[in-house]
């Protein structure tokens, strides 16, 4: 039997590509779609496909009540994702979270509720396989180099700062060891904002300009040497679809929260 998936944010860039990817996969089927502004329309038409006979719902509760669903995937908006995922878990459906912008405290709340429900959640700021390698390499580097900063690049219209990729990376690197500025931020002469934001114990700088899709750069420095690890995303949603659907296939066997596609692929990094 195919894995039945409901997509939240079905009218978005990744959401449309996910609908197409699910329809094309022999082991998956689309059970529902959520997009408030497109409610009532056919999910296939919204995604640029032929008619699928599946209506777009206005809410997660409406979509999951309409058809049996094995996995809920969320690519909605930072303001909606936590409530969406908690609702899915409440209704007995594990979740995959690709929406960026959640804070560490929100992930903690989701993790606790997932454990309580005995269900799995996989959340990643970036579901690209190569981005997960950036994360893993950077976490390994953070174990050995205490001085680091992150630069986050995205299009000028991206609403959340930093991106989910950069935020997740900074928080996870900070959990290994925090990067203490060589000169105290409070004593800086000039605008303190020029040194970036403190995210998870490290400095993060966000660049928002036309021509960028998404790029993240982790820079590590020691006396006399420097290491730069960088990932650049292209204009195709394909890499995110592949990683998201990989997570959807695996989340049904999990309990609790797995944060970061790298942990799903390579296992938890030893302390």
Named regions from a protein language model:
Residues 1-5:
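Extreme N-terminal starter segment of soluble prokaryotic enzymes
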Residues 6-8, 13-66, 146-271:
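C-terminal substrate-binding/catalytic lobe of Rossmann-fold NAD(P)-dependent oxidoreductases
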Residues 8, 75-76, 98-99, 124, ...:
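Structural motif
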Residues 31, 57, 96, 120-122:
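Structural detector of well-ordered beta-strand residues that form the stable sheet scaffold
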Residues 69, 93-94, 115-122, 223-231:
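Glycine/charged-rich beta-loop-alpha catalytic/anionic-binding loops adjacent to active sites
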Residues 83-86, 91, 99-121, 137-140:
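Rossmann-fold NAD(P)-binding glycine/threonine-rich loop
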């Amino acid at each position: 039997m195919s894995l039945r998936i409901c997509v939240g944010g079905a009218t978005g860039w990744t959401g449309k590509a996910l609908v197409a990817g699910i329809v094309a996969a022999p082991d998956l089927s689309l059970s529902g779609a959520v997009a408030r502004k497109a409610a009532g329309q056919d999910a296939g038409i919204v995604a640029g496909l032929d008619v699928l006979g599946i209506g777009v719902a206005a809410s997660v509760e409406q979509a999951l009540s309409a058809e049996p669903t094995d996995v809920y995937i969320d690519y909605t908006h930072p303001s909606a994702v936590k409530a969406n995922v908690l609702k899915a878990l409440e209704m007995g459906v594990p979740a995959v979270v690709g929406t960026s912008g959640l804070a560490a405290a929100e992930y903690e709340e989701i993790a606790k509720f997932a454990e309580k429900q005995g269900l799995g959640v996989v959340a990643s700021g970036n579901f690209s396989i190569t981005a997960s390698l950036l994360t893993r390499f950077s976490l390994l580097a953070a174990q050995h180099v205490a001085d680091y900063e992150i630069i986050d690049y995205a299009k000028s219209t991206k609403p959340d700062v930093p991106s989910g990729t950069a935020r997740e990376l900074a928080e996870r690197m900070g959990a290994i060891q925090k990067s203490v500025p060589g000169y105290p931020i409070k004593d800086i002469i000039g605008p303190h904002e020029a040194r970036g934001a403190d995210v998870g114990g490290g400095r993060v700088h966000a660049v928002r300009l036309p021509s960028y899709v998404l790029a993240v750069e982790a820079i590590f420095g020691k006396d006399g040497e420097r290491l730069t690890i960088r990932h650049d995303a292209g204009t195709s949603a394909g890499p995110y679809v592949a990683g998201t659907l990989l997570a959807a296939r695996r989340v049904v066997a999990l309990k609790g929260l797995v944060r970061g596609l790298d942990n799903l692929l390579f296992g938890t990094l030893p302390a």
